[in-house]
């Protein structure tokens, strides 16, 4: 499964809600997890693999969560989330963020320190969790993808100017790959 890069129009498409979790969607989720692990990522949204279903997968290991690991202890990894909705943001955290669809590019992004996320699981049941720190950042990043928002839209104007050349190069490479 290939991960699409910046410049591919699918990254700007809002996700289509999933009505029912089918065997095909479960297989898609597993393929997305495999692609995410192969790319050393912590999250992946369906748009990043050329699909538009409201689906994202996240796996932030406890050792990567630092001091927030105990706060997220009740959250089972990996998270396979259909129709995730983020609410109740609290606090703020600024940190370096990258994206598998933006290879070699990272920037400082401010996100909520903790959020509540509600979603439908692979079993069709509804779940809710309060997540913190890096896990909250990953959830917000992936749900942004599902809304057609990419992380560089969340960076300051100055940072965006500094990234302009890299983004243009990535967009050209993506366009060339599509032809």
Predicted regions: what they are:
Residues 1-140, 145-179:
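Active-site rim/adjacent substrate-binding subdomains
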């Amino acid at each position: 499964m290939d991960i699409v890069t910046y410049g591919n129009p699918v990254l700007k498409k809002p996700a289509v809600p999933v009505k029912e979790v089918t065997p095909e969607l479960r297989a898609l989720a597993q393929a997305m997890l495999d692609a995410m692990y192969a790319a050393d990522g912590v999250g992946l949204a369906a748009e990043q693999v050329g699909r538009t279903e409201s689906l994202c997968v996240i796996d932030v290991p406890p050792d990567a969560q630092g001091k927030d690991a105990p706060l997220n202890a009740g959250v089972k990894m990996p998270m396979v989330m259909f129709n995730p909705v983020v609410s109740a943001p609290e606090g703020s955290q600024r940190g370096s963020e990258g994206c598998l669809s933006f290879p070699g590019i990272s920037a400082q992004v401010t996100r909520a320190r903790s959020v509540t996320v509600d979603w439908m699981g692979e079993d069709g049941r509804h779940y809710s969790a309060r997540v913190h720190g890096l896990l909250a950042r990953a959830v917000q990043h992936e749900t942004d993808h599902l809304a057609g928002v990419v992380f560089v839209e969340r960076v300051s104007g100055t940072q965006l100017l500094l990234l302009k050349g890299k983004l243009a190069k990535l967009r050209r490479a993506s366009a060339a790959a599509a032809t």
